[in-house]
C-alpha cells in the first residue's frame, strides 16, 4: 500500500474530480486529501482532509513581489509537511494551493501526476508540467502543451462520481412535455438566474415544458417559483448539489455553463445541451471545452458576449423544430460514453500510479 497525497483547492471544478479520484484510490492506497478553505466546502464532512491555505494575491504587476513572498512561505510549509509525512505519490487536480505542494513533491523526488480536465491546459499545470511524471487529460489534443511534453499525456474517460455509471438517458422519446435542465456548475450562474426566467416563460407559451433550474446563492427560491407557477410551469428550483445528476437525470435538453465536469456529466448521461461558456473563465477555457463537444456535433453554443434577449427561446424552438439534428447530437453523445465503466477506469488509474 502506497501513501497518496491528493492536492486540490478553489472551485468545485478542481475539488469534485479530486473526490472522485479519492474514491478510486482509497480501497488500495492510503489516501490523504489536502485542500484550502474555499475547496473544503465541497468536501463531505466525513472525508478526512488537511487544510493547506495559500494566500492568493491579485494578478497585478505591483503585487508580484508580495505574491512571490507568500508562495515562498507556502513552499516552506509544504516542505515541512513532506518531511513529517511519507508520501509516495502526489496527484494534483489544480487550485492555487497545489503549486507549492507539487514543487515540494519534486524536491522530495516523489511521483507526480497532474489532472487537467479542460481542453486548454491551466496556467499552474502548464508551469508544473516540467516537474511531473504524467498528466491525466480528457482530450489528447489538449491546447497549450509543448510538443516536448506530449508523451506525458494520458487520455482518460471523464472521472465521474460512481453513481453516474449506473444512470443513462439513452433513448429519445417524442414526449409532448419537454424536460429542461438549467445548471451552472459548482459556482452557479448569476447570468442564468438574471436572464433566463423571461425566456422560459415565453417558451412555455409555445411548448409544454417542465423546468429544473439551479439558482445562484442569494436568490429567493419561493419568489422565483411564483413567477413560474403563475405561468403554469412545473418547476424544481435548487441551489448547487454535488451529486444532483445522480438523482435526477431524465432531461431532454440542458442549458449549461461549460465547466469540464458539468459537460462530462451531461455527455455521459446523453443529455444534449446548449453551452453558454462563462466569458471570464481563465484563458477562456470554458469556450474551448464547449467547442470540443460542438466539433463532435454533440451540442450547441451561445456566447454570452453575443447574447440577446430571446436567444434561448429561439434556439430551443429551432431545436424542437429540427428533431433530426437533436437525435444526431444525442446519438453522438451516446457514442462518446459507450463502453465506459467505473471498474475499467479504476484499473487504468491505479495501474498508471503503480507503474515504476
Q: At which residue positions do the language-model features occur?
A:
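C-terminal alpha-helical cap of glycosyltransferases
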Residues: 338-356
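Conserved nucleotide-sugar phosphate-binding/catalytic loop shared by glycosyltransferases and other
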Residues: 4-9, 31-70, 156, 184, ...
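An amphipathic, basic-hydrophobic alpha-helix
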Residues: 60-89, 103, 107
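Donor-nucleotide binding loops and adjacent catalytic segments primarily
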Residues: 34, 39-47, 165-169, 173-254, ...
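Conserved donor-nucleotide binding/catalytic region of nucleotide-linked donor-dependent transferases
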Residues: 300, 306-337, 355
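Acidic donor-binding loop of glycosyltransferase active sites
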Residues: 87-89, 249-264, 271-272
Amino acid at each position: 500500500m502506497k501513501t497518496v497525497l491528493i492536492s486540490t483547492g478553489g472551485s468545485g471544478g478542481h475539488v469534485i474530480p479530486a473526490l472522485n479520484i479519492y474514491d478510486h484510490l482509497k480501497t488500495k492506497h492510503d489516501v490523504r486529501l489536502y485542500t484550502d478553505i474555499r475547496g473544503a466546502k465541497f468536501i463531505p464532512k466525513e472525508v478526512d482532509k488537511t487544510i493547506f491555505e495559500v494566500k492568493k494575491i491579485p494578478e497585478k504587476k505591483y503585487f508580484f513581489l508580495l505574491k512571490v513572498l507568500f508562495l515562498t512561505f507556502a513552499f516552506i510549509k509544504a516542505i515541512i509537511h513532506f518531511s513529517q509525512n511519507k508520501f509516495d505519490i502526489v496527484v494534483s487536480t489544480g487550485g492555487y494551493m497545489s503549486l507549492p505542494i507539487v514543487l515540494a513533491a519534486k524536491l522530495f523526488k516523489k511521483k507526480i501526476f497532474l489532472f487537467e480536465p479542460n481542453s486548454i491546459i491551466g496556467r499552474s499545470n502548464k508551469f508544473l508540467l516540467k516537474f511531473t511524471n504524467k498528466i491525466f487529460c480528457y482530450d489528447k489534443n489538449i491546447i497549450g502543451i509543448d510538443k516536448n511534453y506530449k508523451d506525458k499525456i494520458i487520455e482518460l474517460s471523464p472521472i465521474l462520481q460512481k453513481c453516474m455509471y449506473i444512470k443513462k438517458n439513452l433513448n429519445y422519446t417524442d414526449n409532448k412535455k419537454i424536460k429542461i435542465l438549467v445548471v451552472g456548475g459548482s459556482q452557479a450562474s448569476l447570468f442564468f438566474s438574471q436572464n433566463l426566467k423571461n425566456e422560459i416563460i415565453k417558451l412555455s407559451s409555445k411548448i409544454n415544458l417542465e423546468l429544473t433550474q439551479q439558482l445562484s446563492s442569494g436568490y429567493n427560491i419561493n419568489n422565483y417559483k411564483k413567477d413560474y407557477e403563475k405561468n403554469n410551469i412545473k418547476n424544481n428550483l435548487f441551489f448547487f448539489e454535488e451529486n444532483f445528476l445522480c438523482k435526477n437525470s431524465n432531461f431532454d435538453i440542458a442549458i449549461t455553463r461549460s465547466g469540464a465536469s458539468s459537460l462530462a456529466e451531461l455527455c455521459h448521461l446523453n443529455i444534449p445541451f446548449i453551452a453558454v461558456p462563462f466569458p471570464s473563465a481563465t484563458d477562456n477555457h470554458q469556450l474551448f471545452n464547449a467547442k470540443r463537444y460542438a466539433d463532435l456535433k454533440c451540442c450547441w453554443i451561445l456566447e454570452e458576449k453575443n447574447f440577446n434577449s430571446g436567444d434561448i427561446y429561439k434556439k430551443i424552438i429551432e431545436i424542437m423544430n429540427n428533431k433530426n439534428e437533436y437525435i444526431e447530437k444525442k446519438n453522438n453523445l451516446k457514442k462518446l460514453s459507450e463502453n465506459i465503466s467505473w471498474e475499467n477506469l479504476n484499473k487504468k488509474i491505479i495501474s498508471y500510479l503503480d507503474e515504476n
